[in-house]
């Protein structure tokens, strides 16, 4: 541990010393470095700065070479920060291959002397290349661009001296800064939001945080329009075979040999995997996982496997296997291979025996309650003889223990403090693929990393909650002397006003709150597809969120906005009436109108030739809300006894003649007179309508829950089932659609003019179509207009 005096001897300020002393690990590293350096002589301020930088940049993989770097700093072989960075990079790149001193010296410029004359000449050359632009832009010219070019020319030059020379040349060329130079530059106004998140590489090593942040559309600045763009430009992961360069990666004497075989096996290409549990359908959070795993492999020219983590036979059903694979294809991805953790049960068992033989695993008889938590007593069976553990594990395999009577545990402590995680447990449940062959099943923590190794996964990409298991991931692979992939983490995606827990969704189904896993009010991917949300919109939504370590909580309207943007371009427009009111045009025969008119499918794009034919008739239907029997509401802009209204697409203006009422006094029909639209007397509004319509059923979906977080015990003390929105579904049984869409197929999508975007549901029959509302229009649709 470095003392205050030792830190001061490095030339640090009092405030920097105080800050450093708070970091115990860094202080310990500095202490050992100062001790090594002191053996070589007095520490000057320049050397002290380099020694401090060494302590902050040093990674565990190269810690053994600390004496070598200290030696070169103290004998003036390494004099600048660029040299130090190059030295550390060389050591990191040669963690596995080993270092050669001549190569090391060459890589970090040992013995290279950069004189003032060299710096002046390089600055003259670089400024000369940009002179015209510098003169034009004056001090607004980005000096960083010049410094970058100078670093390329003179990588070992002192950065401070180089910067001083550039500043001097600017002064000579441009003279002192004028008032205009000093005036603050106007910046383009950007929407306020949080600072862009760090890229995934930085995120993987960032300290953990339990904070979730709510995201809004303005926070898409760190994302991209497509997953390909996002993963090419933001995902700075390791190169295939350079696993050892990553923080926390543990190397062994066999690492070089294993990595060489691994690179050969994958042909130098990226291999990822998406490993869902087949005990439920996928939800919106899985869309992010699918896109990152499949998307990264695709962007890098590699492949991605779909691996079912089928290690818990109690909860797995065949329907979930097919549903998951179907959704992966729906999102636009094709797995290179479909694999199962159960494919490897025999190998996993043999490795468990090997761990026991190495004294790294033991059979334990503690109950779950005794093992649960962080401050637990070590198992009294932790140090039982290896031979006894082997026999007991064999007895577990052969069905000689009851469920819960014995487990196999690993001898390690996780980052979060949990001790000796369980590797195998007993379950007398037939497995859907292996039948009754096994009664012991491996846990996720044991299976996950080993299956990654078997499949030669290059990048094990997972959500942040697995960060605390990274050490056990590396420990297991290295304990068995097998190839060890690199685990990277990213922030999980959650959505407000819903639940995604499989257990809670099942509760919603069993209580008949929702109909099934694909009920359009849920945020499972099958439900979103059924609601009419396109896979392309989901992929774009995920891409726009970017790569971040933060756990994001998204409001549903953020997804809706992305969906709306997509459908506005891809969903053809049509007219439909939800609650119809019959209008009879009394002078229809005088108008000499055609029996039908052509209406563009995409009127916002005049170059798009697609169109559909709409019937024209004496009797038409409009929305009840588009007519008011009195004129008291001055803000109302549509049909009243004293106010005309226009019909979209047909160039007619309707004027009130009379109402027709039933015996109870309800208006059942309005008789109107029509006239051709003219420039003189334009109505205040134009409304949609249908003629000779077809009846259908329309389902209007809203949020399933009233609260943002229905799982919050403080906000919803009665539990999530007490928070159900009673108006989450409204069914319109006699809606009217135009004949042009009467033959639509399941999943066909349309924009019902002035109402919203709708999709044909699978409940449709040959006689009655059923439409689900996908999203409303931005303005709330016809009901929100005056």
Swiss-Prot record:
The protein's Enzyme Commission number: 6.1.1.18
BP GO annotations: glutaminyl-tRNA aminoacylation
Class of enzymatic activity (EC top level): ligase
Secretion signal span: none
GO molecular function: ATP binding; glutamine-tRNA ligase activity
InterPro entries per UniProt: aa-tRNA-synth_I_CS, Gln-tRNA-synth, Gln-tRNA-synth_Ib_RNA-bd_2, Gln-tRNA-synth_Ib_RNA-bd_N, Gln-tRNA-synth_Ib_RNA-bd_N_1, Gln-tRNA-synth_Ib_RNA-bd_N_2, Gln/Glu-tRNA_Ligase, Glu/Gln-tRNA-synth
Binding site for ATP: 277-279, 283-289, 463, 492-493, 500-502
Highest taxon of the lineage: Eukaryota
Catalytic activity: tRNA(Gln) + L-glutamine + ATP = L-glutaminyl-tRNA(Gln) + AMP + diphosphate
Keywords tagged on the record: Aminoacyl-tRNA synthetase, ATP-binding, Ligase, Nucleotide-binding, Protein biosynthesis
Motif, 'KMSKS' region: chain positions: 499-503
Gene3D superfamilies according to UniProt: 1.10.10.2420, Glutaminyl-tRNA synthetase, non-specific RNA binding region part 1, domain 1, HUPs, Ribosomal Protein L25, Chain P
Annotated spans, Disordered: 181-218
Motif 'HIGH' region: where in chain: 276-286
A GO term from the CC aspect: cytosol
Positions bound to L-glutamine: 309, 444
Compositionally skewed regions (Basic and acidic residues) per UniProt: 181-198
Family: Belongs to the class-I aminoacyl-tRNA synthetase family.
PANTHER family from the UniProt entry: GLUTAMINE--TRNA LIGASE, GLUTAMINE-TRNA LIGASE
NCBIfam families per UniProt: glnS (TIGR00440)
Protein name: Probable glutamine--tRNA ligase
Species name: Caenorhabditis elegans
